[in-house]
Amino acid sequence: MADQATLILIKPDGLKKSLTGNILTRLSETKLEIVASKITRVSNELARDHYKHLKDKPFYEDLIKYIRGELHDRRKVMALVYWGEDAIIKCRSLAGTTNPEEADPTSIRGSYGRITTSGLYENVVHVSANAEDAEREIKLWFEPEDIIVDLYPTKEAVIREKKTS
C-alpha cells in the first residue's frame, strides 16, 4: 500500500485526563512519522466544518460543544498528522471503534473512553475514516507550510518542483 496521511485529534477530554503521553506512546507502535502537530483552540467554525457530515444528527450540538472543550473546561485539542504506509488503517485500529463501550478494551478508546449519562461518546481521539476525509480534515486543521512533507501539492509547488528538477 502507498504512503498516506491521517489526521489525529487528541480531544479535550484526552488533554484534561493527561492522556497525551499515553496516546502518543500507543500511536508510536505504528512506526509512522508525525509530519505536523499543534495544540489549538477549536473555533465554532472549525468544529462545524470538521463535523459537517453529522449536522443532521440529534447529538450534533453536543458534539460541537465537546470538540470545542466546553464540556471539559479544556478548550483545546492536540492535532497531529501521521504519515506512512497504511496510516489510516493502522491508526484506526489502535484507536478502536467510535463507541468506547464497543471498542476493543486494549484500544485507545476502549482503554480511556466513556459514554456520558446523556449518551455522548467521549472517545478521547479522532482518526480520519478514509483518505478523502483525511485530505479534507488535514486541510481544515493545517496550512500547507505547517506540514513537513508536501501531502497535497498545490499548483505552485508542482511548478516550483519542475523548475528545480
Residue ranges and their predicted role:
Residues M1-S165:
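Non-catalytic terminal and connector segments of soluble metabolic enzymes
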